[in-house]
């Protein structure tokens, strides 16, 4: 964590992450590595809040995912970046660019991690990977409005309020 004027940046990385299936019932998250760099606007004020008050303090705030990377050990990599904000009711808004490599393997890993979205994730990533070509990166924009996530006109799912 580092201070940037009134803002706060959070950054870190970890490899060989294993998610305990007991905390993700019905989901299998493959072994992965991850890194992140996230900026929270007016974060100094928010981190000074009592822990129980932080969720409420985040409402109405803006931030930026500068970079968040997940690399699955069995193949597939996703990077996300873009501005995000929470409205006064805790619903997320954002325009996130998702860039990925090895879309087929990434689609398989994400389908196991998010089985309720598998029917959308696997074909979308496979099609984008096919369009990009072998060993190339592909990108798509995820639009999030009031917690509703879509890729273009295709609805992906919902993110509950904080």
What does each model-identified segment do?
Residues 1-162:
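Glycine-rich, small/hydroxylated-residue low-complexity segments
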């Amino acid at each position: 964590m580092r201070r940037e004027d009134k803002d706060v940046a959070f950054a870190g990385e970890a490899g060989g992450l294993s998610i305990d299936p007991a905390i993700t019932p019905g989901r299998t998250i493959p072994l992965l590595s991850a890194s992140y760099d996230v900026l929270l606007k007016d974060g100094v004020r928010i981190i000074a809040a009592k822990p129980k008050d932080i969720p409420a303090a985040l409402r109405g705030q803006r931030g930026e995912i500068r970079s968040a990377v997940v690399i699955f050990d069995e193949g597939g990599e996703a990077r996300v970046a873009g501005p995000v904000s929470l409205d006064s009711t805790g619903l997320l808004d954002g325009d996130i660019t998702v860039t990925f490599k090895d879309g087929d393997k990434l689609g398989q890993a994400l389908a196991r991690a998010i089985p309720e979205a598998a029917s959308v994730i696997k074909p979308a990533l496979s099609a984008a990977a096919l369009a990009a070509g072998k060993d190339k990166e592909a990108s798509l924009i995820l639009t999030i409005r009031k917690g509703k996530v879509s890729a273009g006109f295709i609805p992906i799912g919902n993110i509950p309020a904080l």
